[in-house]
Regions:
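Conserved hydrophobic/aromatic beta-strand scaffold that supports enzyme active sites
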Residues: 21-23, 33-37, 54, 74-76
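Short, charged/polar surface micro-motifs in flexible loops or helix N-caps
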Residues: 29-31, 40-42, 99-101
């Protein structure tokens, strides 16, 4: 059993200002599951995944690939489907990807 309690969650800064990640797990194919914290106005550049990706917005508002999402919304991307992530407000999202994430921008 793997547990990541919010009360002792470790946050790691990313290469993108205003975006932090708390990694839950990595898998053998380069994918991972994590919670991503985004400050309003922050942006993760256009990218695609070798495998599928699933996103659940835990709170706040984001635009992923031009689709506006709010608390409780779910998004699925197919392998190779390019998208960016823009924080419309402060937000927290759960992200699970099957494989690595090459940035295309």
């Amino acid at each position: 059993m793997l547990v990541n309690k919010s009360s002792n969650r470790a946050w790691t800064t990313t290469d993108y200002p205003g975006i932090e990640r708390s990694l839950f797990r990595n898998n053998d194919t380069g994918g991972r599951s994590s919670v991503v914290r985004l400050a309003k106005g922050s942006r993760f550049p256009r990218h695609a995944h070798h495998g599928c990706e699933e996103v659940v917005v835990l709170f706040g508002n984001v635009a992923i690939g031009g689709v506006d999402l709010g608390s409780g919304d779910y998004l699925f991307t197919s392998p190779g489907e390019e998208h960016d992530v823009v924080a419309v407000s402060d937000a927290l999202i759960f992200v699970s990807s099957q494989m690595g994430t090459p940035v295309v921008e």
